[in-house]
Amino acid sequence: MQGNLPPEAQEKIEELQDLQETAQQVAQQKQQAETQLRESETALETLDDIEGDTQMYQEVGELLIETDYDEAYENLEEKVDSLEVRVETLTKQEERVQDQFEGLQEELQEMLQGGAGGGPMGPGGPGAGGA
């Protein structure tokens, strides 16, 4: 189906596919970061309800290491701050990829409507499904 498209249009389609894949990866990373952020915020709220002299353990890899309240609280605050920055960065990256995708899509539609007729893309011009 892409065989009868001009090479420039085929390149744009490949770029669109790459951008779509990138957008999916960024969205997945953002979702994971948001989940970790919610979990960390919940843990911080839980720490607020615990007395400072309560015996605590922190997960380090496969181990649970004894820690004190202040250290646990500080570590969680740092993690929340870091995750907030990560989510913000991924949101901006998601927007950039979306803008690139839309721009490339417009270029492709113009290319197909202006140059090569009968392309498979878009709800474009009249009679745009023929040979």
From Swiss-Prot:
What function is annotated for this protein?
Molecular chaperone capable of stabilizing a range of proteins. Seems to fulfill an ATP-independent, HSP70-like function in archaeal de novo protein folding.
User: Region Disordered: which residues?
Assistant: 19-41, 112-131
Assembly with partners or alone: Heterohexamer of two alpha and four beta subunits.
Q: Which family does it belong to?
A: Belongs to the prefoldin subunit beta family.
Q: Where is the composition biased (Low complexity)?
A: 20-35
Q: Which UniProt keywords apply?
A: Chaperone, Cytoplasm
Q: Tell me the compartments it is located in.
A: Cytoplasm
Q: Quote the protein name from its UniProt record.
A: Prefoldin subunit beta
Originating gene: pfdB
Superkingdom of origin: Archaea
Q: Name one Pfam family in it.
A: Prefoldin_2
